[in-house]
């Protein structure tokens, strides 16, 4: 089934070229089907790239989704045209009186700051509080997951000596959890972060369950409130070349950046990346949408 997006959204052309089923709002409104309302709070500076990554995954399900893109009103985005935000994005103030079936809170390149130092932290806290009573299930990604764990449960983040950067093997820690339906015992996911949350802190919170972690990369998947809150510390949504672009960007800036681990063939940046996370990335998002959004949400929000 399709995702419903604005007919002029630039990501639409990319998705159609990849045979991702998209539908315009005009076409959807002629169908007698209630689409799931999904909000994406896009905190990334590379907004259009992140749009395509997430829409690619949530569009690969049998569900019809009405997608609403959100940006932070209290933060000035310097890497995206204001025209793009005006045309395709809303703010929390625009939607705070609505209810949503699902919400995705993305990562953000602010993890070396304390949460309180982030210029939009107060606005983000209001959105996370709103999600507890107005959203059926919220999926938090990377820094968004760290922010959610801190705000809702007081779980701290800690600086790493070196950036966690690459594609890492993870192990399923809980069996018979719907979010992991169809997962192999071992699976891969990308990570790109300078901070971590610790397994010991997660296990001290009785409302949280650790679902998957990595010996090298640490905590990856955590669930809370019986699935109303999902936290993914990795980046299962990443495209095949995202880590490559991050590596080349930092290298060209003269930063001391290592080659992402387990990513390029033979760990040689002149070789093509090896994509080993795509199937489980699709599975993660489809399981979240099916079991924690579609199966749990009321017909009338």
UniProtKB/Swiss-Prot annotation:
The record marks 192 as: Important for substrate specificity. Substrate binds at residues 163, 192, 249. GO terms for molecular function: homoserine O-acetyltransferase activity; homoserine O-succinyltransferase activity. Pathway: Amino-acid biosynthesis; L-methionine biosynthesis via de novo pathway; O-acetyl-L-homoserine from L-homoserine: step 1/1. The active site is at 142 (acyl-thioester intermediate), 235 (proton acceptor), 237. GO terms for biological process: L-methionine biosynthetic process from homoserine via O-succinyl-L-homoserine and cystathionine. Its EC number is 2.3.1.31. Disulfide bonds: none annotated. Changing residue 142 to A/S: Lack of activity. Pfam families: HTS. Its main location: cytoplasm. It is an enzyme of class 2 (transferase). It is found in: Cytoplasm. Homodimer. Belongs to the MetA family. NCBIfam families: metA (TIGR01001). This is Homoserine O-acetyltransferase. It comes from Bacillus cereus (strain ATCC 10987 / NRS 248).
């Amino acid at each position: 089934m399709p995702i419903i997006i604005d007919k002029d959204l630039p990501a639409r052309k990319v998705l159609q070229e990849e045979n991702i089923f998209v539908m315009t709002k005009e076409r959807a409104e002629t169908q007698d089907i209630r689409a799931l309302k999904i909000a994406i709070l896009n905190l990334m500076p590379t907004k259009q790239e992140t749009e395509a990554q997430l829409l690619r995954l949530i569009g690969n399900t049998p569900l019809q989704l009405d997608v609403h893109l959100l940006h932070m009103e209290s933060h000035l985005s310097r890497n995206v045209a204001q025209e793009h935000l005006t045309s395709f994005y809303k703010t929390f103030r625009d939607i705070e009186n609505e209810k949503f079936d699902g919400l995705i809170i993305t990562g953000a390149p602010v993890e070396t700051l304390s949460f309180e130092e982030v210029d939009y932290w107060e606005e983000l806290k209001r959105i996370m509080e709103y999600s507890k009573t107005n959203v059926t299930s919220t999926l938090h990604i990377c820094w968004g997951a760290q922010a959610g764990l801190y705000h809702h449960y007081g779980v701290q983040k800690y600086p790493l000596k070196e950036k966690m950067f690459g594609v890492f093997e993870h192990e399923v820690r809980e069996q018979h959890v719907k979010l992991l339906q169809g997962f192999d015992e071992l699976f891969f996911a990308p990570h790109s972060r300078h901070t971590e949350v610790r397994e010991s802190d997660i296990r001290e919170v009785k409302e949280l369950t650790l679902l998957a972690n990595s010996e090298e990369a640490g905590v990856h998947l955590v669930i809370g409130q019986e699935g109303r809150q999902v936290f993914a510390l990795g980046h299962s949504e990443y495209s095949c070349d995202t880590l490559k672009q991050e590596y080349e960007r930092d290298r060209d800036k003269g930063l001391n950046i290592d080659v992402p681990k387990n990513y390029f063939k033979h760990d040689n940046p002149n070789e093509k990346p090896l994509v080993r996370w795509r199937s489980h990335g699709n599975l993660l998002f489809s399981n979240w949408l099916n079991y924690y959004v579609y199966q749990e949400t009321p017909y009338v929000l």
